[in-house]
Amino acid sequence: MHKLIIKYNKQLKMLNLRDGKTYTISEDERADITLKSLGEVIHLEQNNQGTWQANHTSINKVLVRKGDLDDITLQLYTEADYASFAYPSIQDTMTIGSNAYDDMVIQSLMNAIIIKDFQSIQETQYVRIVHDKNTDVYINYELQEQLTNKAYIGDHIYVEGIWLEVQADGLNVLSQNTVASSLIRLTQEMPHAQADDYNTYHRSPRIIHREPTDDIKIERPPQPIQKNNTVIWRSIIPPLVMIALTVVIFLVRPIGIYILMMIGMSTVTIVFGITTYFSEKKKYNKDVEKREKDYKAYLDNKSKEINKAIKAQRFSLNYHYPTVAEIKDIVETKAPRIYEKTSHHHDFLHYKLGIANVEKSFKLDYQEEEFNQRRDELFDDAKELYEFYTDVEQAPLINDLNHGPIAYIGARHLILEELEKMLIQLSTFHSYHDLEFLFVTREDEVETLKWARWLPHMTLRGQNIRGFVYNQRTRDQILTSIYSMIKERIQAVRERSRSNEQIIFTPQLVFVITDMSLIIDHVILEYVNQDLSEYGISLIFVEDVIESLPEHVDTIIDIKSRTEGELITKEKELVQLKFTPENIDNVDKEYIARRLANLIHVEHLKNAIPDSITFLEMYNVKEVDQLDVVNRWRQNETYKTMAVPLGVRGKDDILSLNLHEKAHGPHGLVAGTTGSGKSEIIQSYILSLAINFHPHEVAFLLIDYKGGGMANLFKDLVHLVGTITNLDGDEAMRALTSIKAELRKRQRLFGEHDVNHINQYHKLFKEGVATEPMPHLFIISDEFAELKSEQPDFMKELVSTARIGRSLGIHLILATQKPSGVVDDQIWSNSKFKLALKVQDRQDSNEILKTPDAADITLPGRAYLQVGNNEIYELFQSAWSGATYDIEGDKLEVEDKTIYMINDYGQLQAINKDLSGLEDEETKENQTELEAVIDHIESITTRLEIEEVKRPWLPPLPENVYQEDLVETDFRKLWSDDAKEVELTLGLKDVPEEQYQGPMVLQLKKAGHIALIGSPGYGRTTFLHNIIFDVARHHRPDQAHMYLFDFGTNGLMPVTDIPHVADYFTVDQEDKIAKAIRKIHDIISERKRLLSQERVVNIEQYNKETGNSIPNVFLIIDNYDTVKESPFMEEYEEMMSKVTREGLALGVYIILSGSRSSAIKSAIFTNIKTRVALYLFENNELTNIIGSYKKGVKDVKGRAAINDDNFTQFQIAQPFELAEGQTYNERIKNEVAQMKEFYVGDYPKHIPMMPDKVFMEDIREAYDLEKIIHEEHKLPLGLDFEDVELVSLDLTSSSIVTAIKPTEMEKMNDVIMSSLSVYSKNQFVILVDAEDNMSQYSEDVTSYYSAPSDLSNIRLGFKQEIEARKNGEKSIEECKIVFINNIKRFNQLTGMTEDEIRVLFNEGQKVNIIIIASGLYSDTIGAFDRESKMMVRTINQALISHKISEQEFIRVKDRFGEPELKVGEMYYINNQEYQKIKLMEG
């Protein structure tokens, strides 16, 4: 062990050096030592001799290097430089210096320092350091400015190359110079830095002191000694009586010797009786004494035996259930007893309640004395012994949490203290892997239990939160998860009950409820009200009184006071056992909790399998160049083996996965829950294959249903031939079609080369016989469970396809998070290998492996490989390719500077602003090993110019396609004099059956009319815009005319300025649309006439025969649905029917859009050959449009399907791609302007529409009025509504001008006179002003008459002039125009007869005298007098301000619903024909 002190520019650092490791010193915060402004990087390492070097320069005690701002001093200390001295025992001041009188003498120390106040260090925890101003003193590596400073226990002091550490009993010293001192040395060994695994804790073998359980039997006393009950007098009296009788007999009759014999015998009998009596009595007394002595000795031995057993029991209890003070010592010393209890031990979840007289662990057997009249004291002694050892006095009273809910009752503060003792006991002896606590308590009680937050057992690891519920937020955050956990455990028990297999749930949850109000309205209440012991959950209730407890509580503990408690019931049995709770006032509970918090419990010794291994470590390389990819590609051949490294079984023990058909392949399953490393193991496998096999031998098709995450990682990998993400119904069918197309292609190539297996083909390809590469295709689905759920048909077909394609080199790898219910028989039978990482439960493990092993995996990346029927079954650690690629090799790790606060829930909460932990200017994006390897392969591919394999899976159609990407769009290059066949490029089509994507082109001659049906907002207008621009760019304006019917929301308005557009119509322009309908009818009729004239059948033949170029006409209709609701529906549909029937041959095409096919009349829709469908809200509508189509159209704007043979889908092209900052309308205007500037020629004519007002000046600009009036002898009136052409009064015949209202009459007169004023310059014009209100025109005419006398004269003048001209007396060449203002009044004033009127109007026009008569309708046409009727009969020309249906000048067909005429509107009638006109204004 070495210590290195680095000093530079007043910065001081210390580094503990470990043998075999390397270190860096630099400005970089990721370095082991960071020194500001250092200006270089110093690498510390050992050479072969073990000498430490700085940038290859050995450090011999001190090494000084030149730095940018100061010298860099490196001082190396070894064990030999270490010493430790006690403080002086008497004085309170000591000196360290170079003088002999100093308490500690170090010759190299130039200036002495003083250590003071160490005698009180136990109380103050510090000493004082005093030095002079010339001495630099560092405390904890910070330079001190003051001359006196405090140094606390554990602080480091550095002064002039001397390192000191303050301890409670002395100073530790590091000095490269000899330290001489009279002080007591404490130790000679330098303390080592803590090992890397200092805080790890492994269980030691447990020592269990069993409580005695052997029965002890107290035998009954021996049977009492039977006492001889014979009374001595009974033995004496008979012989005495015999003697007395003998004497009586002798006195009566002396017998002699016989008497002596009788007396002798009786005497002897008496003697023997007396002796026998006393002898037996003595023996009896001895036997009684011996019986009593022997039995008491037996009882004494039994007492010793019982006492020994009791002592053993008490020792066992005290050992396994120590006091809290003893527990503190156990934790403090990190004793091996910590976490000694497991769920398999008999005393799991047992804890001490207190001290009590507890039941013996052994059975003391004693048989009571049966009924006996005589009392046997020995029975009493035995009974006394039996009763004396009824209990074990003053022993720990044990309770457990295994047998039903328990409850504490009493004062809450006392109960909380008991719960604290329980917490300490259970937490010390049970690992947090096996036991967790959840407290539902009052918020005010959390402070009492605050110390327990340090216990690792208080963290619910499944929820990553502390097990405290004390308010609404914590309740919702925790209890819902606990509810789900309980539910899952109950379900597991129900399922396992069928197999009679016991389940042990871990961790055990101790659920303490001190406040029921928090759960009373929560769903978890249904489980709290039952016994959950079977499910690994122990319930503890706390209430004030027993009446408040739930009925299912089995054990009740009453805490009466701090010194008295009572175990009322235990497991439903009444025990009423009093006990004395332990006093823990002097125990630091938080200290115990903090000590336990420091321990990281490792349940098993580290396996040979590493916890993790990076991808490059698996290949035993540091840089990607060392992978030797090119050589691997050259040497490895898939037809021999496809084995590639996937992970390690142990150190240098590589596990390979070989999907060769004869090895582990060709198909397989991967299962692993979230966070198990499932995606990572797939990534490593893909990367391993890519490293070992050429892109022409191995390729990947990724199905990432979760959204393309994995696909994005490999987007630059040359082996990747396609990705399938986010499949919907349409994409699923497309994917299947593409895969099947690939199979057909492979079968075709096999047939061409007469092989039937991929391996044979690869041999031919290596030999150069086969030229098209055909790699093994790995189809990998990262989450097929969801895919199968959403697209079951696709999944079924995919598995079936893979089964068929095994000889064609198709490999299928299916991955899922939860295999239960997903892996069916077909998938299982087709999957030879299975990879199982950590799965959610045993059922999932059994589903994939047929064993529960995978449910016990805890590490990410740890997996089982199973091949076949356990032909191979191995546990390994898969490689991780997401590790940071350290290309510089300096292994600098980014120091996370994020500051976290552990909040009240036990969760980390970042509190500093920069959550990245890095300064902005230092932020650096690190490349992963996966990215580095892919980049390396990509560079090799580029360098070797490897040709990409044809992709079986083309990417989904993009959502944005532009016309310029599909065809030439520069109209300058495309416009020509030659008439071209119309081809429309609709967009980018997708033909998975042919593995092709390209322009969707329609030859309009074959395709015919086009109907696009789609829901609003899905590209209908874009479709039309694209066609409009496509036509405009390929044909000049004189070759293509477009009529835009915009019945939607003005979507076609932006393109109206395109020079090809003849006109633009909206639905409210009824008159204009009516004109357009007539215009189209005229076009049809005219073109039919031309074809008939040339005897050809279509417009192309006509153009060819005649050399003419009749333009194609396009009727483009947006939102056809509106037609159904329009007033012009019938006329429009009639026109549409005609065009759809006859238009194709005539070069008239319809392209329409709508939202419903039903809006189009069936007769019309039937004639539309090409039908296109966008996405539709109503699915059944699709069938009506394009026929029976199973795929459907994707919900993407612009995605469409067409009714060709394959129901081809395509993405509608947009007419152009916008430049940055450019708007859509700006882009259109730019191109339109360029077209107009480039084109020289005629533009298509607009549909003429009547302006709001017709001004004389506008007429003058548009027409040559002088010519019309003087040469054509016509008088301009206004514009015709139909053609918007000039309508003029014929001045070669008389006419009448009439109106209903006088005001209208005046206006009409003004218009007539305005035109006549031009005419009068060269012609003779007479104004007869019978109304006398037009005198303002008197100067503009040749003659003006208004006086009644003048009018009478003029009547005669008319007659004479007509006669003179008829007789030839006057020339008829000179035309005289006579305008009569108010013809009725003129007749009244002049008295003209019927015949005179006939002559004036009929005969006068024959001799070039033209009468223009004006008057109100009621006075002229509507009058009933004979003169008026004569006038009407003789005139063929009229200008009437009256509805045509109501006038009587000519007869017309009934016109129902004719609108009222607006101001300035009127009818011009000539020879029974009429035109609606708008009168011009001055």
UniProtKB/Swiss-Prot annotation:
ATP binds at residues 672-679, 1014-1021. Residues 253-256 are extracellular. Residues 1-229, 280-1482 are cytoplasmic. The keyword ATP-binding applies. It comes from the Bacteria. CDD domains: TrwB_TraG_TraD_VirD4 (cd01127). The chain crosses the membrane at residues 230-252, 257-279. It is found in: Cell membrane. Pfam families: FtsK_SpoIIIE, FtsK_SpoIIIE_N. Its main location: membrane. GO terms for molecular function: ATP binding; DNA binding. InterPro entries: Firmicutes_EssC_C, Firmicutes_EssC_N, FtsK/SpoIIIE/SftA, FtsK_dom, P-loop_NTPase, SMAD_FHA_dom_sf. It is a multi-pass membrane protein. One of its GO terms (cellular component) is plasma membrane. Keywords: ATP-binding, Cell membrane, Membrane, Nucleotide-binding, Repeat, Transmembrane, Transmembrane helix, Virulence. Residues 652-846, 997-1183 form the FtsK domain. Homooligomer. Interacts with EsaE. Belongs to the EssC family. This strain lacks esxB and esxC. NCBIfam families: T7_EssCb_Firm. PANTHER family: DNA TRANSLOCASE FTSK, SPORULATION PROTEIN RELATED. Component of the type VII secretion system (Ess). Required for the secretion of substrates including EsxA and EsxB. However, unable to support secretion of the substrate protein EsxC. This is Type VII secretion system protein EssC. The gene is essC.
